[in-house]
Regions:
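Noncatalytic alpha-helical scaffold of FAD-dependent oxidoreductases
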Residues: 1-167, 171-211, 222-248
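Short coil/turn segments at secondary-structure boundaries
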Residues: 55-58, 81-82, 168, 204-210, ...
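Non-catalytic terminal/interface segments that mediate subunit docking, oligomerization
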Residues: 44, 50, 57, 64-120, ...
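Iron-sulfur cluster-binding electron-transfer modules in prokaryotic oxidoreductases
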Residues: 199, 315-640
Length: 640
C-alpha cells in the first residue's frame, strides 16, 4: 500500500501507477513471520518499479485505517461529483493474467467518453474490478453518452477478454441488456425458460437478469435531486445504516435523505406548476409521514456522520429541519432563563413519582402515563421502570478537600436532576463519586455556586431551538471562564454529550474542557491503586464518546477495573438521545433490541458515561447501568 504522501507528490506519480493492499494471516506467529519474509522477498524483486512501499504491520489501528482508505474509494467519488449527478459503480471480472491490460483499456474508455473523475479498484487476486464514475441523466446527450460507454465496456469485458460482466454483485437492471451478449443466445434461452417455469407471471424482481428490452438500462433513471447542501453529496451507499438506532423502527439516514430528495423533487414540480394530481397526493403523504418517520424518530446524535465516507451528518440535517419547523417560543425561552427552578421542580416531581409507584405499582403508572401522553399529544413522557428519583441538591454534596491542583467541575443537567439508578448497588450521587476520586489524586474540586442554573444548551439544540441553546452555552462559558481563573484550571463535566457540545462550541480554547473519563484516565488513574476485579460488566460506549475519542478513555477506565468487560455486538447509538427516550421509548427499544440477550447470567452491572443513556440501557437490559467512575471509586485508593 502507498504510504501517506503529500498531495503534490501524489500528483507527480507516474501515469498508470497502482496501489496494492496486501493482507495475509497464519495460524501462529512463526508461520506469520515466515510468510512476511517470503512476501518481502517477492516485493524486493519489484524494487525498481515501486514508487513507495508501506511496511507490513500487525497494528490493528493501522490495518483498519488502510482498509478504511480502500473501502472509502467508492463513496469518496460522491464527495467531488457535481450536484444532481449520480454515482455509478460496475463490477466485472477478467482472467488475472489480463488484469493489467484491462485496467489500461478501461482508462482509455474513460478518456474517450469523458469520464475524467472515474476510478478503478477491486480484488486483484480474483481478477475482479470495480469502476466508479459520475453521470448526469438530465439531457438526451448525457444519456446517449452513458449508453455508448456501457456498450463499449460490456463488449470489451464479455467478448474481447471473455470475462464476466458481474463478479461479486447481482446483474441488476443496468447489465440485464447485456446478459445475452455475454452468455450467448442458446444459454440465454435456457435462462429465460427457467425464469418462465419459476415465475410465469413475471412478478419476481421483473426486468433483472432476464429483460428483452436492450435499452432497459437507460430508462426509468434515478435523478439525484438537489435538496439541501448538507446532504447533496450523499450517494446513498448505505454505510451509515448499520449504526442508526432507527434502523428497524422507521428510516435510516440513507432513507431519510432519499425520501427528502423525492419531497424536494415534487416540491419543485409543484412550484413550477407541472405536478400531476397523483404526484401532489404523494407529496402530501410524504410530507405528513416524514414528520415522524424522518424527523421525530431521528436521534440526531450524528453517529451516521462517523460512518459516512464523505462526512455527511444526517442528524445535523434533521436538526436544521427542526429549526425550520420550530421557533424559540416563550415556553422554551422561559425554561432556559429559569432552568434552576425548572430543575428543582423536576427533581421534586421525580421523587413524588417514585413514591406513587411504590403505592400503585408499575402497571398502573404505565397505563396512567400512556393515557396522559396520548391526551397531551406526547408532551407528557411515557413511564419507565428505570425512571430514577430526583437527585440531591449539588450544594449539599460540594465538600471537596483542599489541594494545590484544582479542577472546575460542572455536573451535567442529567446528573443534577436524576438520582442514581433505583437498583444500583451504589446509590451515591455521581458528584460524591467524582469528588472522592479526585481527592484521592490530591486534586481539589471547585463547583461554582451558579452551577444549578447552567446547561450546555444541547437539549435546546437537538430540538432546533438554536437561540435558547446559544444563550445557555454563552452563560455556561462565562461561568467556567471565571471559575477556572480564565483557563488556569481545567474544566470537567460528567456526561459525554455535554462535554462534546462544549468542546465543539468553545472557539478560542481559553478553557480546557474535559469529559470526565478522559480527565480521570489522563490525570487521576496513575495516582490510584486499583484492586482489579474478575466480575463481569457490560460496557456501552456513547455516541459522543465515539465522536470525541472513539471511546478510548471510557474503555481504558473499564479495563483498569475489571478483567471481564463485555462490549455487546450490534449496539451503537442507544437511541435515548437526551430526553427523546422519555417521549419516544420505541426508539430506545429498537436500538437496544439485541442487548438483553447478550447479558450473561453472572452479570448484574453495566458501565457507561451518560446518565440519560444509562436510564435507557437499564430499562432495556434488565441490569443496572452506572458511570464507570462508581466502579473505579469502589476499587481504588490513593497511592500519592
Amino acid at each position: 500500500a502507498l504510504v501517506t504522501l503529500p498531495e503534490d507528490y501524489i500528483d507527480a506519480l507516474p501515469e498508470g501507477s497502482t496501489a496494492l493492499l496486501v493482507e495475509f494471516s497464519a495460524d501462529d506467529q512463526n508461520q506469520l513471520t515466515q510468510l512476511e519474509q517470503k512476501l518481502n522477498g517477492h516485493i524486493a524483486k519489484l524494487e525498481s518499479s515501486l514508487v513507495a512501499n508501506q511496511l507490513f504491520t500487525t497494528d490493528s489501528k493501522v490495518i483498519a485505517n488502510l482498509w478504511k482508505i480502500r473501502k472509502g474509494m467508492f463513496p469518496a467519488v460522491g464527495a467531488v461529483r457535481a450536484t444532481g449527478t449520480t454515482v455509478v459503480i460496475e463490477d466485472v471480472a477478467v482472467p488475472v493474467a489480463k488484469l493489467a491490460q484491462v485496467v489500461k483499456q478501461l482508462h482509455q474508455l474513460f478518456i474517450q467518453f469523458g469520464y475524467d473523475e472515474a476510478i478503478i479498484f477491486g480484488h486483484a487476486l480474483s481478477g475482479n474490478l470495480h469502476f466508479v464514475f459520475t453521470q448526469a441523466f438530465e439531457t438526451a446527450s448525457e444519456i446517449e453518452r452513458y449508453h455508448e460507454f456501457m456498450d463499449a465496456v460490456s463488449k470489451m469485458i464479455a467478448i474481447d477478454y471473455q470475462g464476466s460482466l458481474k463478479a461479486e454483485h447481482g446483474t441488476g437492471r443496468n447489465m440485464a441488456p447485456f446478459v445475452e451478449m455475454e452468455w450467448g443466445s442458446e444459454l440465454y434461452l435456457v435462462m429465460s425458460k427457467l425464469k418462465q417455469l419459476f415465475d410465469p407471471q413475471g412478478i419476481l424482481n421483473p426486468g433483472v437478469i432476464i429483460n428483452d428490452d436492450n435499452k432497459a438500462h437507460i430508462k426509468h433513471l434515478k435523478i439525484m435531486t438537489k435538496a439541501d447542501d448538507l446532504i447533496d453529496k450523499c450517494i446513498e451507499c448505505g454505510f451509515c445504516e448499520s449504526v442508526c438506532p432507527s434502523l428497524t423502527l422507521t428510516l435510516t439516514p440513507r432513507q431519510r435523505i432519499a425520501v427528502w430528495r423525492q419531497i424536494s423533487l415534487l416540491q419543485q414540480k409543484h412550484q413550477a406548476g407541472v405536478i400531476t394530481i397523483e404526484q401532489q397526493q404523494e407529496l402530501n403523504t410524504l410530507q405528513q409521514d416524514y414528520q415522524y418517520f424522518g424527523i421525530d424518530s431521528c436521534a440526531a446524535t450524528g453517529l451516521c456522520g462517523q460512518q459516512c465516507p464523505v462526512g455527511i451528518d444526517t442528524g445535523l440535517f434533521i436538526k436544521n429541519l427542526r429549526t425550520k419547523s420550530h421557533t424559540d417560543g416563550k415556553v422554551s425561552q422561559s425554561i432556559a432563563k429559569r432552568f434552576e427552578s425548572v430543575s428543582t421542580i423536576a427533581k421534586f416531581g421525580l421523587s413524588s413519582l417514585q413514591l406513587a409507584n411504590k403505592v400503585v405499582g408499575d402497571k398502573v403508572m404505565n397505563h396512567t402515563f400512556s393515557a396522559m401522553s396520548k391526551v397531551s399529544g406526547n408532551l407528557i413522557p411515557k413511564w419507565y421502570k428505570a425512571w430514577p428519583a430526583g437527585a440531591k441538591p449539588t450544594s449539599i454534596i460540594n465538600n471537596s478537600e483542599k489541594f494545590t491542583d484544582k479542577v472546575v467541575y460542572i455536573p451535567a443537567c442529567g446528573n443534577r436532576i436524576f438520582a442514581a439508578d433505583n437498583n444500583a448497588q451504589d446509590k451515591r450521587a455521581i458528584q460524591e463519586v467524582i469528588i472522592s476520586l479526585l481527592n484521592k489524586a490530591h486534586i481539589e474540586v471547585i463547583i461554582p455556586q451558579q452551577t444549578d442554573k447552567l446547561c450546555c444548551g444541547m437539549p435546546w439544540q437537538s430540538k432546533g431551538l438554536n437561540d435558547s441553546a446559544d444563550a445557555k452555552r454563552q452563560e455556561f462559558l462565562k461561568v467556567i471562564k471565571q471559575a477556572s481563573a480564565q483557563g488556569k484550571w481545567p474544566v470537567i463535566t460528567d456526561a459525554s454529550p455535554c462535554a462534546l457540545t462544549m468542546k465543539v462550541e468553545e472557539e478560542n480554547d481559553a478553557v480546557s474542557i474535559y469529559e470526565i473519563s478522559q480527565f480521570v484516565a489522563e490525570k487521576v488513574l496513575g495516582k490510584l491503586a486499583v484492586n482489579k476485579t474478575d466480575e463481569t460488566f457490560m460496557l456501552h460506549t456513547t455516541c459522543s464518546s465515539i465522536k470525541m475519542d472513539d471511546g478510548q478513555f471510557l474503555h481504558e477506565l473499564a479495563h483498569a477495573c475489571s478483567n471481564n468487560i463485555i462490549i455487546p455486538k450490534d449496539i451503537y447509538c442507544c437511541g435515548f438521545a437526551g430526553d427523546k427516550g422519555f417521549y419516544q421509548p420505541e426508539l430506545n427499544k429498537a436500538a437496544l433490541a439485541p442487548l438483553k440477550a447478550q447479558v450473561p447470567n453472572n452479570c448484574s452491572r453495566g458501565l457507561s458515561n451518560s446518565r440519560t443513556c444509562e436510564i435507557g440501557l437499564s430499562e432495556q437490559s434488565g441490569i443496572s447501568y452506572q458511570s464507570v467512575l462508581y466502579l473505579l471509586d469502589q476499587l481504588s485508593c490513593s497511592n500519592v
